[in-house]
């Protein structure tokens, strides 16, 4: 998930760098959503238009939406849409769960205690 502040153009400009870094370290099939945050602000405060955000997302193959955490608008959707896209990739065989790396959750996923008796999870 890449999030920028629609009232601060610098945060939008940084999205290209952040995306490049994420793709360099992640799976090529990675699902990314671009979220323009603070959509509750007035149009006069806006520094990045919705069309600009959508064009960037289209150009880079990203999902897109604008949200307002303050108004709780589209916040859930920012998480649900990528999850649905990942589910679709798994369902149609584009990716297989065994091919993915990342955080493992479930039995046996906790780190073992080191010699000092400390463990991390």
Descriptions of predicted regions:
Residues 1-16, 26-30, 39-47:
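Conserved Switch II/interswitch segment of TRAFAC-class P-loop GTPases
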């Amino acid at each position: 998930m890449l999030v920028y502040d629609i009232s601060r153009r610098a945060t939008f400009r940084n999205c290209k760098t952040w995306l490049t870094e994420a793709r360099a370290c992640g799976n090529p099939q990675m699902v990314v959503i671009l979220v323009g945050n603070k959509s509750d602000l007035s149009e006069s405060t806006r520094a990045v238009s919705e069309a600009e955000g959508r064009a960037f997302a289209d150009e880079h193959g990203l999902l897109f939406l604008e949200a307002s955490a303050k108004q709780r608008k589209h916040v859930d959707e920012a998480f649900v849409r990528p999850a649905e896209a990942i589910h679709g990739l798994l369902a149609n065989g584009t990716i297989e769960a065994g091919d993915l790396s990342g955080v493992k959750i479930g039995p046996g996923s906790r780190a073992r205690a080191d010699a000092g008796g400390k463990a991390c999870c």
